[in-house]
Amino acid sequence: MNCFSFSFIIIVLCAGSSNAKFREKNSVVFKNSLGVKNVLKIHCTSKDDDLGYHYLRPGVQIYEFRFHDSVLKTKFDCELWQGRGPTYKFYANFRAYKSGGLIAHYGKKNIWEAREDGIYFTHGKEIPKLEYKWSPIGKPPSP
């Protein structure tokens, strides 16, 4: 890598550090917008952390966790189940958060909303859009 490239990277990192949001934690938020009596079961993990199981009733109940990005690529993978627990009928597994690599994010918000037809995503500034469909549990694949 030449001196110009290295200097440019240092300037970008320093400029990002001077941001007012510097060191503000990132967050992942889950909201249960499923039908009446449908519980949302959530389990998220990273390379270093298992955040345990969380159960959300329908309505305004949310689950949120906060963290700082690591230079070594912060990732959180989550599993979601929906149904009338303990019998869950639908499942989804996806990456709920991935850092930007060498340039850490600060104050980034990933909002996931579970609805009957799937899981919707937004950063909070735009209308949520459908990202993942639910997979039925225990149903053999159709031929």
UniProtKB/Swiss-Prot annotation:
The GO biological-process annotations, alphabetized, read as: rejection of self pollen
Compartment(s) where it occurs, according to its Swiss-Prot or TrEMBL record:
Secreted
**GO terms under cellular component:** extracellular region
What keywords is this UniProt entry annotated with?
Secreted, Self-incompatibility, Signal
Q: Which residues form the signal peptide?
A: 1-20
Record Pfam families: Self-incomp_S1 (PF05938)
Family the UniProt entry places it in: Belongs to the plant self-incompatibility (S1) protein family.
**Stated name of the protein:** S-protein homolog 11
According to its UniProt entry, this protein's organism is Arabidopsis thaliana
Q: Which gene encodes it?
A: SPH11
